[in-house]
Amino acid sequence: MAKDNSFDIVSQIDLQEVDNAINQSSKEISQRFDLKGTNTTVERNDTEISINAPDDMKLKNVVDILQTKLTQRGISLKALEYGKIEHALGGRAKQVIKLQQGIDKDQAKKITTLIKDSKIKVQASIQGESVRVSGKNRDDLQAAIQLLKEADLPMNLQFTNYR
């Protein structure tokens, strides 16, 4: 009797790489002519990045710098959820960016229905913040991975524990 093969679908971010990207962004902000001395900050608290800038234009510039540094570090921009730009006293602008960790129930259901509707001979089951896909044939598992990579899902997916 053949043993089932499986893999897990997860959505995780390496927070150390996020910290490195934030440090690189802060260094570039302190050295750039248009941002030097503007008291612009980029900070991470747990799963949120907060950006403080003197005005909207500088805030957008800082977001562009941060996005560039994150992509250079291998962090997908799909893992970022941008909050509204808030205006404080003195015309300062602040934006909070949430880092998406894990797959929520709604997205997990979409992934499982996408796999089931594809008629690939695999089973998908939701396990907390991940989705386990199992099947008899490794080629079917590879087809499921390819299907999910081609589907433009609004989150960053990694495929782990391929057995």
From Swiss-Prot:
Family stated for the protein in its record: Belongs to the YajQ family.
Protein name from the UniProt record: Nucleotide-binding protein Clos_1967
One function term, GO molecular function aspect: nucleotide binding
Keyword Glycoprotein (UniProt): no
Cellular-component GO terms for this entry: cytosol
Function (record text): Nucleotide-binding protein.
Lineage, highest ranks first: Bacteria, Bacillati, Bacillota, Clostridia, Peptostreptococcales
InterPro entries according to UniProt: DUF520, UPF0234-like_C, UPF0234_N, YajQ-like_sf
Keywords recorded for this protein, A-Z: Nucleotide-binding
Species assigned in the record: Alkaliphilus oremlandii (strain OhILAs) (Clostridium oremlandii (strain OhILAs))
